[in-house]
């Protein structure tokens, strides 16, 4: 069964694809466009086709796919993905799970603020009991592209993303807020009983190991945060997630089946829909 479960990690600048039985992705492909649309639909199709061919699963109607998605992926993008996987490759099932939840699972926690440093922007996603707290999600345009052209001091490459001594909320756009300020804003806006468990458990994604110590110390200094984690085994967590979700017998409410898609080709799973929020219980 695990040989027919395919995991797809949709990153800000890359796509990783592999089987759930493997310890790491088999293919890592640059995806510079970031978003998915009709213009790059054919390119995405070729990525899937190449992988299905090398794994000898092209034409296998039992293939199930789990998409580890960006928290801001649109329903339109999901429809394109589903259309490719169902119409072009006749897959049996497609499920979507926010990457932030998988990173929590990889860190063996149900509660955290997950910071994902992307190419064009950075997201801060509060997770409680493995549920994204939608109304408290924030993002900043401070991403990797902003610091790529800089010549940083040793260990300080990501400093402008996380902290800015000259930052003044009155003079800056809301979407240009440094990440540490975003996290503070999230914590202050949370219900009182949720503040401590999330403030004390920060997960940071897409930071090179050489910069981890600097960022960890910065958070401890500016936020008195007790636990900073940089997940390394998200692929294994995604595999475990796939086995739980895709082996569930019955109505899988975080994904759609082939027949369901053909009955309604406009359908697309939306994690923030009420029924999808209740479905997270199956990850326990």
From Swiss-Prot:
Keywords, sorted A to Z: Cytoplasm, Cytoskeleton, Dynein, Microtubule
Pfam families hit by this protein: Actin (PF00022)
InterPro entries noted in UniProt: Actin, ATPase_NBD
GO molecular function, one term: nucleosome binding
GO cellular component terms listed in the entry, alphabetical order: actin cytoskeleton; cytoplasm; dynactin complex; dynein complex; microtubule; Swr1 complex
Subcellular locations according to the entry: Cytoplasm, Cytoskeleton
SUPFAM superfamilies attached to this UniProt entry: Actin-like ATPase domain
Any one of the GO BP annotations: actin filament-based movement
Subunit structure: Self-associates. Component of the dynactin complex composed of at least ARP1, JNM1, NIP100 and ARP10. Dynactin comprises a short rod of the ARP1 filament attached to ARP10 at its pointed-end and probably associated with the capping protein at its barbed-end. The rod is implicated in dynein cargo binding. A sidearm formed by NIP100 projects from the ARP1 filament and is implicated in motor binding. Interacts with ARP1 and JNM1.
Role played: Pointed-end-associated component of the dynactin complex which assists cytoplasmic dynein by increasing its processivity and by regulation of its cargo binding. The dynactin complex is required for the spindle translocation late in anaphase and is involved in a cell wall synthesis checkpoint. May regulate the association of the dynactin complex with the plasma membrane.
Family of this protein: Belongs to the actin family. ARP10 subfamily.
Protein name: Actin-like protein ARP10
């Amino acid at each position: 069964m695990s040989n027919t479960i395919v995991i797809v990690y949709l990153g800000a600048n890359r796509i990783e694809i592999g089987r759930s039985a493997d310890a790491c992705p088999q293919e890592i492909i640059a995806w510079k466009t970031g978003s998915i649309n009709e213009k790059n639909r054919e390119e995405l199709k070729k990525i899937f086709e190449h992988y299905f061919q090398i794994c000898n699963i092209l034409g296998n109607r039992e293939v199930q796919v789990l998409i580890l998605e960006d928290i801001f992926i649109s329903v339109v993008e999901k429809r394109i993905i589903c259309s490719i996987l169902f119409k072009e490759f006749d897959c049996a099932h497609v499920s979507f799970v926010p990457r932030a939840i998988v990173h929590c699972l990889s860190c063996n926690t149900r509660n955290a603020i997950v910071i994902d440093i992307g190419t064009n922007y950075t997201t801060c996603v509060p997770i409680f009991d493995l549920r994204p707290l939608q109304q408290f999600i924030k993002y900043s345009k401070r991403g990797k592209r902003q610091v790529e052209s800089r010549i940083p001091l040793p260990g300080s490459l990501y400093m402008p993303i996380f902290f800015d001594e000259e930052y003044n909320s009155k003079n800056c756009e809301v979407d240009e807020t440094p990440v540490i300020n975003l996290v503070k804003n999230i914590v202050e806006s949370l219900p009182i009983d949720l503040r401590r468990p999330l403030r004390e458990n920060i997960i940071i994604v897409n930071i090179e190991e050489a910069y981890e110590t600097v960022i960890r110390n910065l958070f401890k200094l500016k936020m008195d945060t007790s636990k900073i984690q940089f997940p390394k085994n998200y692929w294994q967590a995604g595999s475990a997630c796939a086995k739980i979700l895709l082996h569930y017998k019955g109505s899988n409410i975080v994904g759609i089946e082939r027949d369901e898609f053909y009955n309604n080709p406009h359908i697309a799973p939306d994690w923030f829909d009420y029924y999808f929020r209740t479905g997270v219980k199956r990850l326990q």
